[in-house]
Amino acid sequence: MTSIWIELAKAVPSVVTAVTAVVGVCIAARGLNKWRAETIGKRKAELAEDVLADFYQARDIIKAARSPGSFGYEGATRRKADWESEDDTRTLNAYFATIERLNNNAEFFAQLHARRYRFIAHFGHDAAKPYDDLFRIRGEVISAVQMLIMTYRDRDQGSLPADRRDWERIMWERRNPADPIPGNLDRIVEAVENTCRPAIQEAAK
């Protein structure tokens, strides 16, 4: 019996060492998982802040681009046609000013769109729908301006007068309920807020 206890006593340090090692590994793994979760959460929150700021800025850019007022130099990057009178040029440049303002922010919109893929990776495809809605509005505004310019010489023919009024309503912001674009932009931003704010607030805890 004595020899058995001696052998057990000899084995105890090894067992303690093994148990300590296992406990150490568990603690390290738990710490690593916590660090990884915190790092991912921080990155997700930083992305959420950037995306939310992007959409705030995009809304302001589109609203500013649709402002009916323009300076005399705006729209001058448009290629002038041979048939244009001075009045024609002023009118057409005033139209084109909307596209010009958006073109001046082309790099911003490219960066906004590039961030979309990281956003999908963190928040899923459904959460990225506001990107599609935002670029659809931007595209509708640009198309409306292009149609107004293309049909300018034939503006009094057929259904064009009515069509052109519709395009003008899309191109220029109207401060009345008949203009749906400001409300649609606000809803797009609200959808992004609903996705991003929880991630931002969680990281701040």
Predicted segments, located by residue:
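Membrane-embedded hydrophobic alpha-helical segments
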Residues: 1-38
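Short hydrophobic/aromatic-rich motifs at helix boundaries and adjacent loops
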Residues: 3-8, 86-91, 164
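Alpha-helix boundary/capping and short turn/kink residues
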Residues: 25, 41-45, 121, 125-128
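Transmembrane helix-loop junctions and nearby membrane-interface residues
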Residues: 25-32, 61-68, 147-151
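Short amphipathic alpha-helical/adjacent loop interface patches that line ligand
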Residues: 32, 55, 189
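Amphipathic, membrane-active segments
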Residues: 36-76
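Hydrophobic alpha-helical transmembrane segments and immediately flanking/interface helices
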Residues: 75-92
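An amphipathic alpha-helical interaction surface
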Residues: 83-87, 96-205
